[in-house]
């Protein structure tokens, strides 16, 4: 269970809501609430990897240790069993490992500092990963609970995405 001031749902409920939100982004149903994520979704080549990453992103929650690191390791074992290619498996593992990174940078760091953007870009490494991480992060945050996503968070996420995309 992850009931606290921030989370309104159990991990499994959160995961299913996040997958539904991801679908809403893909179909355009959330265009007003998540315009940048909706805009970049058609450009994403690794949609299957994105959905699997969303399914598995909190798989290690509740275990002792860093759930992102542990979940990335689980993905390396599970993804091939699901029929994903080596490249898709690596993408899923990378997304799970870094699924908290974009929100952490956007909400806690100075986005006007070029070093912040350069450091983030060096981890992301490609436009495809940037798009994947943006969409995953938006869906993950929106699935935490009602009224968690707001204009301030949307603006910071957009600013980080656009700044990194320009690098």
Residue spans of the language-model regions?
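Short amphipathic alpha-helical interaction/hinge segments
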Residues: 26, 30, 104-107
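Divalent metal-dependent catalytic cores for phosphoryl transfer on phosphate-bearing substrates
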Residues: 10-11, 37-166
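Amphipathic alpha-helical
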Residues: 7-29
């Amino acid at each position: 269970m992850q009931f606290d001031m921030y989370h309104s749902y159990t991990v499994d409920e959160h995961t299913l809501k996040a997958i539904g939100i991801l679908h809403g982004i893909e179909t355009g149903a959330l265009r007003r609430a998540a315009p940048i994520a909706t805009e970049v979704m058609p450009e994403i080549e690794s949609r299957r990897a994105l959905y699997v990453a969303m399914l598995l992103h909190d798989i290690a929650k509740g275990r002792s240790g860093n759930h992102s690191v542990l979940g990335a390791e689980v993905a390396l074992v599970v993804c091939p069993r699901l029929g994903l290619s080596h490249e898709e498996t690596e993408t899923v593992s990378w997304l799970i490992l870094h699924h908290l990174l974009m929100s952490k940078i956007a909400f806690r760091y100075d986005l006007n500092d070029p070093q912040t953007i350069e450091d983030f870009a060096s981890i992301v490494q490609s436009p495809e990963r940037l798009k994947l991480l943006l969409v995953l992060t938006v869906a993950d945050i929106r699935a935490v609970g009602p009224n968690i996503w707001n204009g301030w968070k949307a603006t910071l996420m957009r600013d980080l995405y656009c700044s990194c995309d320009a690098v």
